[in-house]
């Protein structure tokens, strides 16, 4: 659950890291 929150935060405060956010979401789902 923490991972999901972090992913959301990343996409929220950094649109530039949208790619990173997408990867984070994928990783979170895999985990």
UniProtKB/Swiss-Prot annotation:
Disulfide bonds: none annotated. Keywords: Cytolysis, Membrane, Nematocyst, Secreted, Target cell membrane, Target membrane. It comes from the Eukaryota. One of its GO terms (biological process) is killing of cells of another organism. Its main location: secreted. It is found in: Secreted; Nematocyst; Target cell membrane. One of its GO terms (cellular component) is membrane. Cytolysin that shows weak hemolysis and weak myonecrosis. Circular dichroism reveals that this peptide presents mainly random coils as its main secondary structure. This is Cytolysin Oshem 2.
């Amino acid at each position: 659950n923490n991972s999901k929150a972090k992913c959301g935060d990343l996409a929220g405060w950094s649109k530039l890291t949208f790619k990173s956010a997408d990867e984070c979401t994928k990783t979170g789902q895999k985990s």
